Design a protein with these regions (language model features):
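Active-site metal-binding core of divalent-cation-utilizing nuclease and nuclease-like domains
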Residues: 1-22
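Short, surface-exposed, polar/charged, turn-prone segments marking secondary-structure boundaries
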Residues: 29, 53-57, 92-97
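Helix N-cap / beta->alpha transition motif
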Residues: 45, 77-85, 109, 132
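Conserved catalytic cores of phosphodiester-cleaving nucleases, focusing on short active-site segments
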Residues: 16-18, 23-34
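Charged phosphate-binding loop/patch that engages nucleotide di/tri-phosphates or the phosphate backbone
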Residues: 106-151
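Nucleic-acid nuclease catalytic cores
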Residues: 53-86
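Short, electropositive alpha-helical surface patch
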Residues: 77-104
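Mg2+/Mn2+-dependent nuclease catalytic core
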Residues: 32-51, 58
Length: 151
């Protein structure tokens, strides 16, 4: 496969990352007007999954996707890479599961993001939104610490 001349090729492993209270948060950002985000390689690229999965191997790193569902009302959810991979495997292979909501074998719907993810609180301003990422990071650190202490 050859790229067209002048085609942009990302050299970054993540769309963005935050550092907060000694933790690193690598994020892949996905936005849609639909009620689900497709697993299509055009939308979620294999190297994005690979890099997030690799990051999950290290302490104090909480990697995942930020899924923005713009319509009918703007909602954003963080889904940890491990939770995403578990869901994707169950959905694509039609395995038995304990999800309360219906699964879709080719995408992750907003209802599953609500169930397995953490909502990013936001406030609508005149034109744009303000996202409360400090609150999100605090919530994710607490979840991480609880899962580590449970083991």
């Amino acid at each position: 496969m050859f790229l067209k001349r002048g085609a942009a090729v990302s050299k970054n492993k993540y769309d963005c990352f935050l550092h907060f209270k000694g933790y690193l948060f690598p994020f892949e950002l996905k936005s849609t007007k639909n009620k689900s985000v497709s697993f299509s390689e055009k939308i979620i690229k294999p190297q994005q999954i690979k890099h997030l999965k690799e990051a999950a191997q290290y302490p104090n790193i909480i990697p995942g996707f930020l899924f923005q569902f713009r319509e009918p009302e703007n909602k954003v959810y963080f889904v940890h890479i491990n939770d995403f991979l578990t869901y994707k495997n169950i959905a694509e292979n039609q395995l038995s599961h304990t999800y309360k909501n219906k699964i879709n074998k080719s995408s992750i719907p907003i209802s599953i993001c609500e169930e397995i993810g953490t909502e990013v609180r936001l406030m609508k301003k005149k034109v744009n939104y303000t996202y409360y990422l400090n609150k999100l990071c605090d919530d994710l650190i607490k979840k991480e610490q609880q899962s580590v202490s449970a083991v």
